[in-house]
Amino acid sequence: FFERRNYQGASGKIYPLPFTASISDEKKDKKYDAYVLENKYIKATLLPEIGGKIHSILDKTNNYDIIYHNKVIKPAMVGLCGPWVSGGIEFNWPQHHRPTTFIPVESKEKNETVYMGEFDNFFSMHGTVGISIKEDRNYVKAHIIVYNSTPFRRRFMWWANTAVEINDNYAVDFPPDVSSVNDHDRRCVLSWPI
């Protein structure tokens, strides 16, 4: 039944990943494991249990939430494998929204960097993002590592889905050499600027 479901330009085939067919409407408290990285300027909270996303980034100098995040975790049934949670910064690969955005990923902390990643069963690749904050900087750095464990060339997309509050203080800027962008599907190429 699910294999014929088209999902944002991708096949609904998800085997061998687990599929969650429904979620409860019952509200209950739940604790999530989190990594907190901070310096005197910013504080970032990372949630490896929810697909390895950056849940929040706070500007400590003015108590401003740099990215939009939900105060509660309330999944919706819009993900390829079922649940998905909006907000924060979601790291996606090898296709549009990762199928595992609500599934725990591997994580470890090493040398003041938190590494979160997983093995992709569809393409036999491993993707990891290392998140760090330098002591004297007011930004978060993401270091991306993709490893192809096969002898074959693999196409993939890597993108970060960042939630921001819509207001007049935000703009999307691309380098001047960017002439095209992708939608959810790598086959959907749009000219830039629009």
What are these regions (language model features)?
Residues 24, 44-62, 118-167:
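Acidic, contiguous internal or C-terminal segments within carbohydrate-active enzymes
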Residues 62-93, 98, 141, 147-194:
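Polysaccharide-binding surfaces and accessory modules of carbohydrate-active proteins
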